[in-house]
Structures are given as structure tokens and as C-alpha cells.
Amino acid sequence: MREFEADGRSIQAEPGETILEALRREGIHVPTLCHMEGLPPTGACRLCVVEVEGVPGLVPACSYPAAEGMKVRTRTPRVLQARRTIVELLLSSHPDDCLYCARSGRCDLQKLATDLGIRQRPYRGVQPRQELDVSSPSIIRDPSKCILCGRCVRMCEEIQGVSAIDFIGRGSRTYVGAAFGSGLNLSSCVNCGQCLLVCPTGALSEHSSLDAVVAALGDPTKTVVVQHAPAVSVSLAEEAGLKPGTDVDGQMVAALRRLGFNYVFDTSFTADLTIMEEGSELVERVTKGGVLPMLTSCSPGWIKFVEQFYPDFIPNLSTCKSPQQMMGAIIKSFWAERQGLDPARIVSVSIMPCTAKKFECTRPEMAPAHVPDVDYVLTTRELGQMLRMFGVDLAAMEPQAADTPFGERSSAGKIFGASGGVMEAALRSAHFLITGREIEHVRIQALRGFKGIKEFHVEIDGLEVGAAAASGLANARTLLDQVRAGRRDLQFIEIMTCPGGCINGGGQPIGADLKAVRARME
């Protein structure tokens, strides 16, 4: 350990830690805009500058190593003025439409300006008029609000391995965009929305379907049916100001009915169908010489990733639809017939933790006879906004059960939202199908957790099955490249597009730290 002084306090730093890491661990706040936890620092925004005794200039705390005996000052007039000037310069060319911005009240730049007491605009910069990119069904890009922090670029390239966006141009003409100035719909974007989660301003936001859903709820000729994913019930609490990880499943069902939805179904029901189908398919492929390793097919961002970057692995994908699309198909076929309803008059809405689900429901193969199985997808954030719009207090709702017959679920369906959950549930099903016995639960939990790639080998009635679970598409690349190179000990691979799984999806509450995401998993 190395000891140094910060604002008169003694701070212990681990070897290799930066000043910022040591200060944050001790609860000392230093503002940043470009910093991303877990990635090497760039020092681009300079908001984290501090004074170090003996060093003539201000130093970036995010990249300056903590050293024994150094004396650091984080809030001197010189430091505070430097931070104010940086934010004032960022605001000099930033749009003034905060009241109409999707991130109003949750904008890092807005909060910094408030915290630093900036009430006037001392600098006037050029505000270039750049068109909104609304080409993607999942994400809206507003280049005029981009502050070039680089967080979206790093997320897309380093964590997701997609590189759909990058810095374009030089100097004051630099901007972030897709190749050749095209829209996101023509780029390699997989619609995961992870860029949206790390964007500090309103430069990136989801393509909202909220107005369309509200209009449908007000149409007496429509039967509006809603399904909700298991990951939503453990994250919606944050939108209502409750403790992260609080499971509000029953209250959410009651709130959805209060909003006016005619029927409320639990997507965990079709997650159970997915588990049984994938388990059966795995057994058949392993025992009858099918294409291996079998790859899960629940995550739409991952499916687009395979189609674009690894088309040779398309035969390896499970034949299952995602639980969302399974439920949508059942609602507009079996359930509609049972209820005596015209599928064309059913509005099928899903509440998902994922922006890529908005893309998935628009795929032509998900609209037999040109009638989409799922009409609209709302993210967890959009549902939170809808509750506030309608004045529904989630915490005050009495818990209710989802409607039958699609309100029943097993515990296996509930764990779908966490990385490793699909794999664990499918392996348990495969084990039961082969042996007639439940698998030892403690051992299979090796597939859970936040590790990017997890592996597990199990013997099922003399049959050796190697399984791996990866979350984050850069980790998916690693596994697929190993299989391409000749690795043969894996028969089943689960891929979740988002790091940690759906609990950390692109449609989840903004501003959640790792502690909050872990609480959702638990």
C-alpha cells in the first residue's frame, strides 16, 4: 500500500492505482466526463484535474499514478476555476433546449453546470446545425449535443467489439458518427444501446414508442396486451426511487393494469418454453450429431452480431425465437383464437430491458402475413416515464398476479435476465430430460456472475457436455474465434449482448453503477 495526503486526509492507495481510483474508493468525489470504470484512462476531458504539490501544472487524476508521500489538493480555487472553465467551454456550443431534451434532469453536463454554479454563458461558440439520426428503430442520435467525451466510441469498440461509430474529422470539425456519414441503420450497429447508457448528455437516446402506446390505450376498438421481461421487475424500482435490486414484480403488474392495459402477461412463461425447447434441441444435437456448439438465440443484438460478423455460425444458432417473440406469436394466434379476438385489433406491447428488442420486433420474419407479433417495445426507462406521466405511484401499489394462462413461471424463467441464466436453466432441463433427475444446483451456479466468460463442464448420464457463457460482444468474439480455430470441448454457448446480461441492458435506468447492477442480479 502507498500512503498519500488528499485535502488533509490520509489516503491508502493500492500499487498501480491512479489518484482518481484511490480518492473514489475513499469516498472523495472528483468529477469526470470521459472516464470509464474498468478501461484505461484517456484523460481527454480534464475535468478531474487536481493540484499535486511540487508539480507546476494541474494533473488529471484519472491517469496520474498515486505515489507515496504526495500531497493532493482537489478543491483549491485554481482547481475549481479550471473545472468551471472546461464546463463553460463545453456549454458555449451546446444547445439550450434542456427542457425538451430526453436527458433533462439526468444529464451529467447539466449536473456539472449546476454543481459548479454556472449561471451565465461567458463564451459564445458556434452551434453547428446537425441533423438528427432517426434511422435506427432503437436509437436516436443527436450530434449537436455530443461533447466528444468518447465514451460511446470506447463502449462500442472495446467492450462490445462492434465499432459502429468513431471519431470523424479533425480539430473543431470532429464529430462522432457512423462510417461514410451514414445513419446507424446502415452501420454495423447491433442496437444494444450500451452507448446510450454511458453517454453523459442527450446525444444518444432510445427511439421511443411511448406516444404510440398511450394512443393505443385510449383507443376503445383495441385490446392492448402487455408482457414484461424478468429483468424489468428488478430494475424498475430505481425509476421509482426505490432501492436498486428491489423486486417489484407484483406492484408492476398492478401498475400496468392501472395504466389501462387489458391483459398483463409475464415473459418468464415463454422463457420457460425457450428453456424446454433449447434443452431438447441440445440433447438432440449432442446425441444425434447435430451442428455444435449450439448457440443461444434469445438476445437480438447478439443475433445481428452473428449475421454481420460471423455468418458461418448461423447454423449453430438455436432454432428458438426469443421469449418476447414467442409470447407475441402466442398472443396473436393461440390466445387470440381462444379469446375470440381479431389479431389485427390486438396491440401487443412488451416491456423490455433492451433497446435491441425494438429492432427485433420490426424484423419482417417476425410479422407473418404482415401482422407483427409484437407491435411496440417499451424500455424500463420508458415504463418509468409512463408511470410518472399517469401519476402512478409504484411503491403504493398492492401486488397483483399476472393474467392466466401466461402468468405462470418457474424459477428458471426468472433467472433469464442474468448472464449464465439461460445456460443454467437449459442445462438443468437437458439433464432432467436425459436422466429424469434434477441436476445438482450448487455446481451449476458456476455459470452465474459478472465474469466476461464462464465455463462449466458436466457429465449427464455418461455424456460429457462443455458449456460456456459470455456477456459483452467482445467476449463473444473471443469464444467464437476459439471455436473457429478448432476448439471442440464446448457443446453449448450462451451469449448475452450486454455485459452482465439483460439486467444491464441498454433500456435499463441510466446512471446505475456496478453495485446497482449486482443488486439486480442478486
Segments and roles (model prediction):
Residues A6-D7, I139-I140, S182, E238-G241:
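Short, contiguous strand/loop micro-motifs
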Residues R46-N191, L197, L204-T223:
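Fe-S ferredoxin-like electron-transfer domains
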Residues M1-R9:
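Eukaryote-biased recognition of intrinsically disordered, low-complexity regulatory segments
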